[in-house]
Amino acid sequence: MKLFFKTYWTYFVSFIIPIIIMIGVYLSQGIYWNSDTSPLLGDGFHQYVIFDIALRNILHGNGSLFYTFTSGLGLNFYALSSYYLGSFLSPLVYFFDLTNMPDAVYLTTLLKFGLIGLSTYFSLNKLFQSIPKPLKLALSTSYALMSFTVSQLEIKTWLDVFILIPLIITGLHLLITEKKILLYFTSLSILFIQNYYFGYMTALFLIFWYLCQISWDFKTRKSSVLDFIVISFLAGMASLIMTLPTLFDLQTHGEKLTEVTKFQTESSWYLDLFAKQFIGSFDTTKYGAIPMIFVGLLPFILTILFFTLKSIKFHVKLIYAIFFAFLIVSFYIEALDLFWQGMHTPNMFLHRYAWIFSTLLIYTAAEVLNRLKEIKIWNFLVSLFLIVTGFLATIYLKSHYSFLTDLNILLTLEFLVVYSLLLLAVIKKFISVNLFAILISLFIMVDMSLNASSQIDGIAKEWGFASRSSYNRDIPAMESFSAYIGNQFTRTEKLQTQTGNDSMKFNYNGISQFSSVRNRSASSTLDKLGFKSSGTNLNLRYANNSILADSLFGIQYNISDSPIDKYGFKDIYQKDNLTLYENQFSLPIAFASQSVYNDVKFTEHTLDNQASFLNQLANVNFDYFSPIPYEKTEKIENTNDLISITSSSNEDAAIQYQIEVPENSQVYLSFTNLHFSNDKQKKVDILVNGEKKTFTTDNVFSFFNIGYTKEKKTFNIHVSFPGNSQVSFESPTFYRLDTLTLTEAIQKIKEQPVTVSTSKNKVFATYDVQQDTSIFFTIPYDKGWSAYQDDKKIEIKQAQTGFMKVDVPKGKGTITLSFIPNSFITGAICSFTSLLLFGIYNYKRKLYKV
């Protein structure tokens, strides 16, 4: 053991230094194991930790890796995992639970920073054996803590990419120089499997990087071209077990390619390259950001030095310069910026390929440190002049970079002086190389620690680390409800949600969803039926819809912290401040239509769509919704078809109405084109006969449940808009839903019973129908679904674009739906074939050598 540690102690140090620094950086935010402040912020809170919880439940036997019903009516979990869960460390979530999952995020994030340091040190040690170990440790720490990784740590699966990149670079070097192909093939295959998005960028990077590497000795290294092409292809092929189903899912449900509408990228300016080389510089991770390229001040200095060294041939410098120039130009030209990102505009976290620039800086700096004794005074002075000129120009014109503070400038100039003095000292041989290595490594650790702390401060101010209490809110009650509901294959929705993925967090089947991986066909259809999912369908929300939609989509349970006043919903269980309500009129997740189902045409009118959809299913022609006349009790201002309400003094804008409601009515208030003067406050408070209801308008329609009455009744309604002195909207409409008519239509569908259950990635629907009909599944249509009856495959048809139906004859039967991601089997065969071909190719190469 002592011998092992003596031999490999630097590997341990390369792993532990980034972890220690990040522990300190986290601590500065009050974050540690089981701390009151969690390590969750932004998407980390709303998405990543929740998907970790879903994976944990699956690993414990509750669910399938292929499909989940806890999001968006149903979702291809395999495709979601390829984007959000691709990590070596994802299986560790098995050992955590819902309550302490933030600690899993804390632990795995620290481990990933450590593993980046370790893999980078391994790479530098293989490629540059003559560089003193402290310098390699300094560079590996710089890479682990570069601005790109720290500022975007909430997207924690991105960190895994940088564990693999140094291994891929090392593998490519071994392929070129020693004809060894295993490391390159293995590491590249794993990257493609873990993260197809960064895999695409890496593939582009490797083309340029390969040209850079063969330029060092073209005559000898050109023979590696065939190996590079074949092994890269086989690595891509080996990943098809994951990437092929994902690509087909993206083809069906992904966003359209972004059109290039302008020449220059947003917010870019001439000195961006220097502005982001100031220690601690942080602008934003939202829109209008310039690239996160800082990887330490010293690598930047050494990269400039690289182009002045005589021992490096001109054509090598030229190839490297072209690569650097192409990257820099890409930061400015919209078309190239999109090209690196697959022709898709990122939803914040811009310039996602900026890590390539940082990677280039590290490995170019290593080339210079490998030639430390060759550096002359004039090399250093030329480089220093260029750097100082760039920094001074940026300082002089810093009005263009409002994020640069005096502290950023002071720290950068101080470290620039320190690095310059140390470089001068080693060039003039005032100090030994070993002493230089130790001293400069210590300063680099401080440099990167300060920068990491600044990045964390930046994202904390921008997104805010969630408190542990906020994360834990409602967990005991929700777990109690989950136990009460049991394993019923029904749907549940929580009315006061914290995230768009609460159903996945608390492990109940629901509608709401917030994910880049989604079934856009289903979401678009649901949008027309009142569950808002506009634009690219990134969000889908349950709130602010009708009880008719509840019935159609099998919402059997509602959870609320206040009375919900919905027809058919009865309170059945209470825990803490939450109450569980059961819907007496919900349909099962699969039900029989009255005849073979034919699509109805949807319009832009949500309630008309709901009515025509239910009528088609029940084979009736009922009117469910009708407007209710109302009286305004206050004067309001009408301009351009908009009603504008302005409050006096500091009061909230408010308006009052009075309506006469017929018996057996569920009442709704619809605002169209509702605009708030305060975009940060978008809630609506409604008092109905003195009883208060609060609604959100965030990512949902402005369609509010006023309440249910069995008898004829007068509703006095007071609508206020907290935090807003002025609001405007089109003339509102009060709607009455006839509950007797709704009940009749739902009962007519229930006359032909269908019993539904599920197991893993299968759904079982047992039916008894009196005529030829369709079994309608309110499950998103996906080509991964197959239907079987009596061990024979039967046809699944799309219904209303987003859903599924299976036509069946009169009688009894059971339909089994099975989900295997589209092209999964083909991808698995390709992956197995790739491994076989790799083995054969490697064997033939060895045979050829012999």
Feature map (PLM): residue ranges:
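Extracytoplasmic/lumenal acceptor-recognition loop(s) of multi-pass membrane glycoenzymes
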Residues: 443-464, 483-552, 587-588, 592-604, ...
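Periplasmic/ER-lumenal interhelical loops and adjacent helix-loop junctions
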Residues: 42, 46-47, 53, 88, ...
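Membrane-interface micro-motifs in multi-pass membrane enzymes
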Residues: 78-83, 102-115, 135, 142-166, ...
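Active-site-proximal, structured, solvent-exposed surfaces of multi-pass membrane proteins
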Residues: 2, 631-850
